[in-house]
Amino acid sequence: MAGVRLVVIYPRPADIDKFERDYIEQHLPMAAQKIPGKTKLVSAKVLGTASGDPAPFHRIAEVYFPSLQALQEAAGTQGAQATIAHAQAISTGGPPIFLVMEEAAPVPL
């Protein structure tokens, strides 16, 4: 199996400034330090939709792992469980969406 990633999609929070502070100052450092076995951590802020409308989501994080087994092992650790609980606590616009994705072959351009 190819590498996998955990994608976390955060709904638009009730208080964007507070969410941003908590996310940048607390959550990202926690994820970087406490989730074992990851190969990369990427965070992006959603600017809007292609039509220019406000997006229903505010942030998307991607945590990369070399295999599904590595992700599953990481998810069972206290550090990952604490990070997941923190993600849920700071997501004031509703619960975050957690997706597991398998990387596919690149598409030639």
Over which residues does each language-model region extend?
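Macromolecular interaction modules
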Residues: 1-109
